[in-house]
Amino acid sequence: RKCLNTPLPLFYKTCPEGKDLCYKMNFKLLPKKLSIKRGCTDTCPKSSLLVKVVCCDTDKCNK
C-alpha cells in the first residue's frame, strides 16, 4: 500500500507489511482541505469530538 504521509497531499510512502490502511485526520473546526496528519495504519483510529478520521484501502486514497 502507498499512502500520503504529509499534511499537504504531495508525498507518499510505501507502508510496512501489516499496515494496509491509509488514514487522514482533520480538525472538525478547520476547513476540510487542511489535514493535520496522514499515513499508514493497521486499524482505523477512532474519530473524536475535535478530530475526524477517514480510512481507506487503496493506494494514495487519503487525499
Curated annotation (Swiss-Prot):
It comes from Aspidelaps scutatus. The keyword Disulfide bond applies. SUPFAM superfamilies: Snake toxin-like. PROSITE patterns: SNAKE_TOXIN (PS00272). Expressed by the venom gland. This is Cytotoxin homolog S3C2. InterPro entries: Cytotoxin_Cobra, Snake_3FTx, Snake_toxin-like_sf, Snake_toxin_con_site, Toxin_cobra-type. Its main location: secreted. Belongs to the three-finger toxin family. Short-chain subfamily. Orphan group XVI sub-subfamily. Disulfide bonds join 3-22, 15-40, 44-55, 56-61. It is found in: Secreted. The keyword Chaperone does not apply. Is classified as a P-type cytotoxin, since a proline residue stands at position 31 (Pro-31 in standard classification).
